Swiss-Prot record:
One of its GO terms (molecular function) is cobalt-precorrin-5B C1-methyltransferase activity. It comes from the Bacteria. Keywords: Cobalamin biosynthesis, Methyltransferase, S-adenosyl-L-methionine, Transferase. Signal peptide: none annotated. This is Cobalt-precorrin-5B C(1)-methyltransferase. It comes from Burkholderia ambifaria (strain MC40-6). It catalyses: Co-precorrin-5B + S-adenosyl-L-methionine = Co-precorrin-6A + S-adenosyl-L-homocysteine. NCBIfam families: cbiD (TIGR00312), PRK00075.1-1 (NF000849). HAMAP family: CbiD. InterPro entries: CbiD, CbiD_sf. GO terms for biological process: anaerobic cobalamin biosynthetic process; methylation. Belongs to the CbiD family. It holds the Pfam family CbiD. Its EC number is 2.1.1.195.
Protein backbone atom coordinates (compact mmCIF):
# COMPACT_ATOMS: atom_id res chain seq x y z
CA UNK A 1 0.00 0.00 0.00
CA UNK A 2 1.20 3.50 -0.76
CA UNK A 3 0.48 6.59 1.28
CA UNK A 4 0.30 9.60 -1.00
CA UNK A 5 1.56 12.22 1.47
CA UNK A 6 3.98 11.80 4.39
CA UNK A 7 2.63 12.18 7.88
CA UNK A 8 3.83 15.06 9.98
CA UNK A 9 5.96 13.76 12.85
CA UNK A 10 6.25 16.88 15.03
CA UNK A 11 3.65 17.47 17.75
CA UNK A 12 0.86 19.75 16.59
CA UNK A 13 -0.25 22.84 18.50
CA UNK A 14 -3.93 23.32 19.33
CA UNK A 15 -5.68 26.68 19.04
CA UNK A 16 -8.91 28.42 19.99
CA UNK A 17 -12.23 28.67 18.19
CA UNK A 18 -13.88 31.86 17.02
CA UNK A 19 -16.39 31.17 19.79
CA UNK A 20 -13.62 31.40 22.39
CA UNK A 21 -12.35 34.60 20.77
CA UNK A 22 -15.84 36.10 20.87
CA UNK A 23 -16.24 35.10 24.52
CA UNK A 24 -12.92 36.65 25.56
CA UNK A 25 -13.49 39.90 23.69
CA UNK A 26 -17.11 40.35 24.78
CA UNK A 27 -16.13 39.70 28.40
CA UNK A 28 -13.25 42.19 28.23
CA UNK A 29 -15.42 44.91 26.66
CA UNK A 30 -18.23 44.31 29.15
CA UNK A 31 -15.84 44.36 32.11
CA UNK A 32 -14.47 47.70 30.94
CA UNK A 33 -18.01 49.11 30.99
CA UNK A 34 -19.17 47.50 34.24
CA UNK A 35 -15.98 47.58 36.31
CA UNK A 36 -13.73 50.10 34.57
CA UNK A 37 -10.96 47.54 33.99
CA UNK A 38 -9.13 47.67 30.64
CA UNK A 39 -7.28 44.37 30.26
CA UNK A 40 -4.53 43.23 27.91
CA UNK A 41 -5.52 39.59 28.48
CA UNK A 42 -8.62 37.87 29.82
CA UNK A 43 -9.30 34.47 31.34
CA UNK A 44 -12.28 32.47 30.14
CA UNK A 45 -13.66 29.06 31.08
CA UNK A 46 -14.20 26.65 28.20
CA UNK A 47 -17.27 24.37 28.01
CA UNK A 48 -15.37 21.42 29.53
CA UNK A 49 -14.05 23.49 32.41
CA UNK A 50 -10.55 24.40 31.22
CA UNK A 51 -9.41 27.90 32.10
CA UNK A 52 -7.43 29.68 29.40
CA UNK A 53 -5.88 33.14 29.18
CA UNK A 54 -6.40 34.94 25.87
CA UNK A 55 -4.36 37.95 24.82
CA UNK A 56 -6.15 41.08 23.61
CA UNK A 57 -5.05 43.41 20.84
CA UNK A 58 -7.10 46.27 22.27
CA UNK A 59 -9.77 47.00 24.86
CA UNK A 60 -11.22 50.50 24.77
CA UNK A 61 -14.21 52.75 25.32
CA UNK A 62 -16.22 53.77 22.23
CA UNK A 63 -18.92 56.36 21.64
CA UNK A 64 -21.71 53.89 22.46
CA UNK A 65 -20.01 51.30 24.67
CA UNK A 66 -16.71 49.42 24.56
CA UNK A 67 -14.87 47.11 22.20
CA UNK A 68 -12.10 44.54 22.43
CA UNK A 69 -10.27 42.43 19.87
CA UNK A 70 -8.04 39.38 19.71
CA UNK A 71 -6.15 37.60 16.94
CA UNK A 72 -7.59 34.16 16.20
CA UNK A 73 -4.90 31.54 16.78
CA UNK A 74 -5.92 28.19 15.31
CA UNK A 75 -2.65 26.53 16.31
CA UNK A 76 -1.45 24.15 13.62
CA UNK A 77 -4.90 23.62 12.15
CA UNK A 78 -5.38 24.78 8.52
CA UNK A 79 -8.19 27.12 9.57
CA UNK A 80 -9.40 29.87 7.22
CA UNK A 81 -9.78 32.24 10.19
CA UNK A 82 -6.25 31.75 11.55
CA UNK A 83 -4.68 35.17 12.10
CA UNK A 84 -7.95 37.09 11.69
CA UNK A 85 -8.94 39.81 14.14
CA UNK A 86 -12.09 38.81 16.04
CA UNK A 87 -13.71 41.66 17.94
CA UNK A 88 -16.69 42.38 20.15
CA UNK A 89 -18.58 45.62 20.63
CA UNK A 90 -20.66 45.72 23.80
CA UNK A 91 -23.30 48.20 24.89
CA UNK A 92 -25.15 48.18 28.20
CA UNK A 93 -28.94 48.01 28.22
CA UNK A 94 -31.65 48.54 30.80
CA UNK A 95 -33.34 45.35 29.56
CA UNK A 96 -31.81 42.26 31.20
CA UNK A 97 -30.29 39.42 29.19
CA UNK A 98 -27.78 39.16 26.36
CA UNK A 99 -28.68 40.01 22.77
CA UNK A 100 -26.42 39.10 19.86
CA UNK A 101 -25.80 41.04 16.65
CA UNK A 102 -23.73 40.38 13.52
CA UNK A 103 -20.95 42.90 13.07
CA UNK A 104 -18.74 43.33 10.00
CA UNK A 105 -17.53 39.98 8.73
CA UNK A 106 -20.10 37.84 10.57
CA UNK A 107 -22.89 36.31 8.52
CA UNK A 108 -26.65 36.19 8.86
CA UNK A 109 -28.79 33.04 8.48
CA UNK A 110 -31.10 33.24 5.45
CA UNK A 111 -32.20 29.61 5.01
CA UNK A 112 -34.08 27.15 7.16
CA UNK A 113 -32.39 23.95 8.33
CA UNK A 114 -29.59 25.36 10.47
CA UNK A 115 -29.47 25.40 14.27
CA UNK A 116 -30.39 29.10 14.23
CA UNK A 117 -33.60 30.73 12.96
CA UNK A 118 -33.62 32.69 9.72
CA UNK A 119 -32.57 36.28 10.34
CA UNK A 120 -30.29 35.50 13.27
CA UNK A 121 -26.57 36.34 13.27
CA UNK A 122 -24.45 33.27 12.53
CA UNK A 123 -23.21 32.93 16.10
CA UNK A 124 -23.70 29.27 16.98
CA UNK A 125 -25.43 28.04 20.15
CA UNK A 126 -22.34 27.03 22.16
CA UNK A 127 -20.52 30.37 21.64
CA UNK A 128 -23.75 32.15 22.57
CA UNK A 129 -23.96 30.12 25.77
CA UNK A 130 -20.29 30.75 26.55
CA UNK A 131 -20.74 34.50 26.21
CA UNK A 132 -23.98 34.52 28.18
CA UNK A 133 -22.45 32.51 31.02
CA UNK A 134 -19.45 34.83 31.32
CA UNK A 135 -21.50 38.02 31.08
CA UNK A 136 -24.04 36.77 33.63
CA UNK A 137 -21.19 35.97 36.02
CA UNK A 138 -19.68 39.43 35.46
CA UNK A 139 -23.03 41.10 36.17
CA UNK A 140 -23.48 39.08 39.36
CA UNK A 141 -19.93 39.86 40.53
CA UNK A 142 -20.43 43.63 40.22
CA UNK A 143 -24.14 43.83 41.06
CA UNK A 144 -25.10 44.98 37.58
CA UNK A 145 -28.83 44.44 36.93
CA UNK A 146 -29.03 45.45 33.27
CA UNK A 147 -28.34 43.56 30.06
CA UNK A 148 -25.81 43.50 27.24
CA UNK A 149 -26.00 44.04 23.50
CA UNK A 150 -23.11 42.12 21.97
CA UNK A 151 -21.96 42.63 18.39
CA UNK A 152 -19.33 40.20 17.10
CA UNK A 153 -17.22 40.93 14.03
CA UNK A 154 -14.30 39.43 12.12
CA UNK A 155 -11.99 41.70 10.16
CA UNK A 156 -12.07 40.60 6.52
CA UNK A 157 -14.69 38.00 7.37
CA UNK A 158 -16.88 38.64 4.35
CA UNK A 159 -14.03 37.72 1.99
CA UNK A 160 -12.90 34.80 4.16
CA UNK A 161 -16.44 33.40 4.16
CA UNK A 162 -16.21 32.88 0.40
CA UNK A 163 -13.60 30.19 1.14
CA UNK A 164 -16.07 28.33 3.36
CA UNK A 165 -19.39 26.60 2.75
CA UNK A 166 -21.37 29.49 4.26
CA UNK A 167 -22.66 30.92 0.95
CA UNK A 168 -24.05 27.53 -0.04
CA UNK A 169 -25.60 27.05 3.40
CA UNK A 170 -27.40 30.37 3.10
CA UNK A 171 -25.24 32.23 5.61
CA UNK A 172 -24.61 35.56 3.90
CA UNK A 173 -22.35 38.49 4.65
CA UNK A 174 -19.58 36.74 6.53
CA UNK A 175 -18.33 33.91 8.70
CA UNK A 176 -19.98 31.85 11.40
CA UNK A 177 -18.82 32.05 15.01
CA UNK A 178 -18.19 28.41 15.81
CA UNK A 179 -17.01 25.95 18.41
CA UNK A 180 -18.36 23.29 20.74
CA UNK A 181 -15.35 22.80 23.02
CA UNK A 182 -13.64 26.16 22.58
CA UNK A 183 -10.50 24.44 21.34
CA UNK A 184 -9.33 23.84 17.77
CA UNK A 185 -7.61 20.46 17.59
CA UNK A 186 -5.20 20.25 14.64
CA UNK A 187 -6.68 18.44 11.66
CA UNK A 188 -9.78 17.38 13.60
CA UNK A 189 -11.70 19.31 10.92
CA UNK A 190 -14.73 19.48 13.21
CA UNK A 191 -15.93 22.71 11.60
CA UNK A 192 -15.76 21.14 8.13
CA UNK A 193 -17.70 18.08 9.28
CA UNK A 194 -20.28 20.33 10.93
CA UNK A 195 -20.71 22.19 7.63
CA UNK A 196 -21.33 18.87 5.86
CA UNK A 197 -24.08 18.07 8.35
CA UNK A 198 -25.51 21.56 7.95
CA UNK A 199 -25.49 21.22 4.17
CA UNK A 200 -27.57 18.05 4.39
CA UNK A 201 -29.93 19.63 6.92
CA UNK A 202 -30.43 22.73 4.77
CA UNK A 203 -31.15 20.59 1.70
CA UNK A 204 -33.74 18.56 3.63
CA UNK A 205 -35.38 21.65 5.13
CA UNK A 206 -35.76 23.12 1.65
CA UNK A 207 -37.42 20.04 0.18
CA UNK A 208 -34.47 18.56 -1.71
CA UNK A 209 -34.80 14.77 -1.85
CA UNK A 210 -31.72 13.97 -3.98
CA UNK A 211 -28.30 15.10 -2.79
CA UNK A 212 -24.87 14.47 -4.29
CA UNK A 213 -21.89 14.18 -1.95
CA UNK A 214 -18.70 15.07 -3.82
CA UNK A 215 -15.01 14.96 -2.94
CA UNK A 216 -14.15 18.19 -4.75
CA UNK A 217 -14.90 20.70 -7.49
CA UNK A 218 -14.37 18.30 -10.37
CA UNK A 219 -16.80 15.74 -8.98
CA UNK A 220 -19.29 18.51 -8.17
CA UNK A 221 -19.14 19.70 -11.77
CA UNK A 222 -19.68 16.13 -12.96
CA UNK A 223 -22.77 15.68 -10.78
CA UNK A 224 -24.15 19.09 -11.69
CA UNK A 225 -23.80 18.31 -15.39
CA UNK A 226 -25.11 14.75 -15.07
CA UNK A 227 -28.23 15.48 -13.04
CA UNK A 228 -28.75 19.24 -13.25
CA UNK A 229 -28.78 19.45 -9.46
CA UNK A 230 -28.95 22.86 -7.78
CA UNK A 231 -26.03 24.01 -5.65
CA UNK A 232 -28.04 23.39 -2.48
CA UNK A 233 -28.14 19.68 -3.36
CA UNK A 234 -24.36 19.44 -3.81
CA UNK A 235 -22.59 18.50 -0.57
CA UNK A 236 -18.85 19.14 -0.60
CA UNK A 237 -17.72 16.25 1.59
CA UNK A 238 -14.01 16.42 0.79
CA UNK A 239 -12.40 13.40 2.44
CA UNK A 240 -15.19 12.89 4.97
CA UNK A 241 -17.39 10.25 3.38
CA UNK A 242 -18.21 8.91 6.82
CA UNK A 243 -19.58 12.28 7.91
CA UNK A 244 -22.16 12.10 5.12
CA UNK A 245 -23.11 8.47 5.56
CA UNK A 246 -23.42 8.57 9.35
CA UNK A 247 -25.43 11.80 9.32
CA UNK A 248 -27.96 10.22 6.98
CA UNK A 249 -28.82 7.74 9.73
CA UNK A 250 -30.62 10.49 11.62
CA UNK A 251 -31.32 12.86 8.74
CA UNK A 252 -32.10 10.63 5.74
CA UNK A 253 -32.87 11.76 2.22
CA UNK A 254 -34.58 9.79 -0.52
CA UNK A 255 -31.54 9.53 -2.77
CA UNK A 256 -27.78 9.90 -2.34
CA UNK A 257 -25.26 10.06 -5.16
CA UNK A 258 -21.61 9.91 -4.11
CA UNK A 259 -18.97 11.00 -6.58
CA UNK A 260 -15.22 11.22 -6.31
CA UNK A 261 -11.91 10.55 -7.94
CA UNK A 262 -11.16 6.90 -8.59
CA UNK A 263 -8.43 6.79 -5.94
CA UNK A 264 -10.66 8.33 -3.27
CA UNK A 265 -13.52 5.95 -4.11
CA UNK A 266 -11.15 2.98 -3.91
CA UNK A 267 -10.44 3.91 -0.29
CA UNK A 268 -14.15 3.99 0.52
CA UNK A 269 -14.51 0.67 -1.30
CA UNK A 270 -11.87 -0.76 1.05
CA UNK A 271 -13.92 0.35 4.05
CA UNK A 272 -12.22 3.64 4.91
CA UNK A 273 -14.57 6.48 5.85
CA UNK A 274 -11.86 9.17 6.03
CA UNK A 275 -10.32 9.36 2.57
CA UNK A 276 -7.36 11.60 3.39
CA UNK A 277 -3.91 10.09 2.92
CA UNK A 278 -3.11 10.70 6.59
CA UNK A 279 -5.77 8.17 7.53
CA UNK A 280 -6.11 5.79 4.60
CA UNK A 281 -3.97 4.57 1.73
CA UNK A 282 -4.69 3.29 -1.74
CA UNK A 283 -4.47 -0.50 -1.61
CA UNK A 284 -3.09 -1.59 -4.98
CA UNK A 285 -2.97 -5.31 -4.05
CA UNK A 286 -6.67 -5.12 -3.17
CA UNK A 287 -7.43 -3.49 -6.53
CA UNK A 288 -5.51 -6.30 -8.22
CA UNK A 289 -7.51 -8.86 -6.21
CA UNK A 290 -10.81 -7.32 -7.32
CA UNK A 291 -9.55 -7.29 -10.91
CA UNK A 292 -8.65 -10.97 -10.58
CA UNK A 293 -12.19 -11.74 -9.45
CA UNK A 294 -13.36 -10.11 -12.70
CA UNK A 295 -11.03 -12.19 -14.83
CA UNK A 296 -7.69 -10.32 -14.80
CA UNK A 297 -4.77 -12.58 -15.68
CA UNK A 298 -1.63 -12.93 -13.58
CA UNK A 299 0.37 -10.46 -15.68
CA UNK A 300 -2.24 -7.72 -15.28
CA UNK A 301 -2.50 -8.35 -11.55
CA UNK A 302 1.27 -8.05 -11.17
CA UNK A 303 1.34 -4.85 -13.22
CA UNK A 304 -1.43 -3.36 -11.10
CA UNK A 305 0.33 -4.22 -7.85
CA UNK A 306 3.47 -2.53 -9.19
CA UNK A 307 1.65 0.58 -10.43
CA UNK A 308 2.78 3.97 -9.16
CA UNK A 309 -0.75 5.34 -8.71
CA UNK A 310 -4.35 4.20 -8.64
CA UNK A 311 -4.88 5.98 -11.96
CA UNK A 312 -2.16 3.86 -13.54
CA UNK A 313 -3.76 0.71 -12.14
CA UNK A 314 -7.12 1.80 -13.55
CA UNK A 315 -5.63 2.50 -16.96
CA UNK A 316 -3.98 -0.93 -17.05
CA UNK A 317 -7.22 -2.66 -16.09
CA UNK A 318 -9.36 -0.78 -18.60
CA UNK A 319 -6.86 -1.45 -21.38
CA UNK A 320 -7.27 -5.17 -20.66
CA UNK A 321 -11.06 -5.00 -20.61
CA UNK A 322 -11.45 -5.22 -16.83
CA UNK A 323 -14.11 -2.73 -15.57
CA UNK A 324 -12.16 -1.76 -12.47
CA UNK A 325 -14.05 1.52 -12.04
CA UNK A 326 -17.37 -0.29 -11.83
CA UNK A 327 -15.90 -2.87 -9.44
CA UNK A 328 -14.60 -0.19 -7.09
CA UNK A 329 -17.94 1.62 -7.17
CA UNK A 330 -19.77 -1.62 -6.39
CA UNK A 331 -17.58 -2.25 -3.33
CA UNK A 332 -17.97 1.37 -2.22
CA UNK A 333 -21.73 1.03 -2.62
CA UNK A 334 -21.76 -1.98 -0.29
CA UNK A 335 -19.85 -0.01 2.34
CA UNK A 336 -22.29 2.89 2.09
CA UNK A 337 -25.37 0.67 2.22
CA UNK A 338 -24.12 -0.92 5.43
CA UNK A 339 -24.26 2.54 7.07
CA UNK A 340 -27.23 4.45 5.69
CA UNK A 341 -30.88 3.47 6.25
CA UNK A 342 -32.40 1.09 3.72
CA UNK A 343 -34.81 3.86 2.71
CA UNK A 344 -31.95 5.85 1.13
CA UNK A 345 -31.29 4.93 -2.50
CA UNK A 346 -27.51 5.11 -2.95
CA UNK A 347 -25.37 5.20 -6.07
CA UNK A 348 -21.64 5.65 -6.66
CA UNK A 349 -19.71 7.39 -9.41
CA UNK A 350 -15.94 7.41 -9.96
CA UNK A 351 -14.28 10.01 -12.18
CA UNK A 352 -10.83 10.54 -13.63
CA UNK A 353 -8.81 13.73 -13.25
CA UNK A 354 -10.63 15.31 -16.19
CA UNK A 355 -14.03 14.70 -14.61
CA UNK A 356 -15.02 11.85 -16.93
CA UNK A 357 -16.94 8.94 -15.44
CA UNK A 358 -14.81 5.80 -15.19
CA UNK A 359 -17.18 3.73 -13.09
CA UNK A 360 -20.59 3.61 -11.47
CA UNK A 361 -22.81 1.35 -9.38
CA UNK A 362 -26.37 1.58 -8.12
Amino acid sequence: MRDETPERAAPLRFGYTTGSCATATSLAAARLLVAGHADDAVEIVLPKGQRVMMRLEFCRITADGAEAGTIKDAGDDPDVTHGALVFARVALSAAPGVRFHAGPGVGTVTRAGLTLPVGEPAINPVPRQMMTTHLDALAAEYGYAGGFDVTIGVEGGEALALKTMNPRLGIVGGLSILGTTGIVRPFSCSAYIASIHQGIDVARANGIAHIAACTGNTSEDAMRAHYGLPDMALIEMGDFAGAVLKHLRRAPVSRLSMCGGFGKLSKLAAGHLDLHSRHSSIDLPLLAQWAAEAGANDALQAAMRAANTSQEALKLALADGVPLGDLVCAHALRVARDIVPASVAVEMFAIDRQGRFVGSAR
